[in-house]
UniProtKB/Swiss-Prot annotation:
Protein name per Swiss-Prot or TrEMBL: Profilin-5
More about this protein: The variability of the residues taking part of IgE-binding epitopes might be responsible of the difference in cross-reactivity among olive pollen cultivars, and between distantly related pollen species, leading to a variable range of allergy reactions among atopic patients.
Compartments, record wording: Cytoplasm, Cytoskeleton
PTM comment, free text: Phosphorylated by MAP kinases.
Keyword Plastid: no
Quaternary structure, from the entry: Occurs in many kinds of cells as a complex with monomeric actin in a 1:1 ratio.
Residues modified as Phosphothreonine: T114
Keywords, sorted A to Z: Actin-binding, Allergen, Cytoplasm, Cytoskeleton, Disulfide bond, Phosphoprotein
Molecular function GO terms recorded: actin monomer binding
Cleavable signal peptide: none
Known role: Binds to actin and affects the structure of the cytoskeleton. At high concentrations, profilin prevents the polymerization of actin, whereas it enhances it at low concentrations.
Membership in a protein family: Belongs to the profilin family.
Keyword Cytoplasm applies: yes
Length: 134
């Protein structure tokens, strides 16, 4: 299965039980910042933004004072799982990032999708990739 198929079929899909509710944007990005696959709507990010995200996974709390930036959008960092999941909020939307052995799985959402639904979609794929050694 191609990486793009994972994004299209497992991240940008309808949320279970909620037809037409789906993430706004999604991507799978290598730890080095290389894009493996992304939705057409995923923002163009700067290398320093990806460096900040990777630093926060290695040093939890790094982004808390400045916020998480992706594609020029600033998200307030909210409760995540140290070294495994970063979550951010901006207005009625937000972002979930799950770290796997080789990649970061990104999901960006806006209402009516809820933070919990975004977390479920992103973390389910991230957990699957971890189980596959990726």
């Amino acid at each position: 299965m191609s990486w793009q198929t994972y994004v299209d079929d497992h991240l940008m899909c309808d949320i279970e039980g909620h037809e037409d509710h789906r993430l706004t944007a999604a991507a799978i990005v290598g730890h080095d910042g290389s894009v493996w696959a992304q939705s057409a709507t995923f923002p163009q990010f700067r290398p320093e933004e990806m460096n900040g995200i990777m630093t926060d996974f290695n040093e939890p709390g790094h982004l808390a004072p400045t916020g998480l930036h992706l594609g020029g959008t600033k998200y307030m960092v909210i409760q995540g799982e140290a070294g495994a999941v970063i979550r951010g909020k901006k207005g009625s939307g937000g972002i979930t990032i799950k770290k796997t052995g080789q990649a970061l799985v990104f999901g960006i959402y806006e209402e009516p999708v809820t933070p919990g639904q975004c977390n479920m979609v992103v973390e389910r794929l991230g957990d699957y990739l971890l189980e596959q050694g990726l």
